[in-house]
């Protein structure tokens, strides 16, 4: 992903154009696409070491994604949709789904730390994929359209998400340990 980091480095010089080009929804959809691609690679992988590597990358990407959604996106979405009962219900469901995803991620990470890339771990990655696909579908088809109409400043929220994501990556995921 050298292109992505090179693009991120130049964003300081072109912040307004970058913000318009990658609002919060665009950033979250890009994350969804990245994780979907990793799951596809995982399904094709035959070597246990490669599967373990991909499972770890999937877990890391999802952990970062969940953190920025929970810390920044969901609270602001909740404020923007405060008069929309369906929107609030979608956010409640998304937060509950995150809880289930975190349990599976923790179980997969425990297995990886114990070097257990077995059938059970493989099944957990498959179930994680199914949960993520369901979660993504609801966000992209139901929640995001509501937020586009809400008046929420998605460019500003996108900038906040980008900054937090960069902080987490710079901290090497250590800042996330206290979130669990």
Which ranges hold each PLM region?
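Small-residue-biased structural context
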Residues: 1-180
């Amino acid at each position: 992903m050298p292109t992505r980091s090179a693009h991120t480095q130049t964003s300081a010089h072109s912040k307004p154009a970058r913000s318009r080009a990658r609002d919060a929804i665009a950033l979250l959809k890009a994350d969804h696409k990245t994780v979907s691609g990793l799951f596809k690679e995982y399904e094709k992988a035959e070597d246990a070491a490669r599967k373990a590597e991909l499972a770890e990358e999937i877990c890391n990407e999802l952990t970062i994604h969940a953190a920025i959604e929970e810390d920044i996106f969901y609270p602001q979405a909740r404020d923007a949709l405060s008069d929309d009962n369906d929107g609030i219900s979608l956010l409640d469901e998304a937060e509950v789904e995150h809880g289930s995803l975190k349990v599976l991620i923790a179980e997969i990470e425990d297995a990886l730390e114990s070097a257990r890339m077995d059938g059970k771990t493989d099944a957990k990655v498959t179930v994680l994929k199914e949960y993520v696909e369901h979660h993504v579908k609801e966000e992209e088809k139901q929640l995001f359209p509501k937020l586009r109409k809400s008046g929420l400043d998605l460019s500003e929220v996108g900038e906040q998400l980008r900054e937090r994501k960069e902080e987490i990556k710079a901290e090497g995921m250590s800042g996330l340990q206290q979130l669990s």
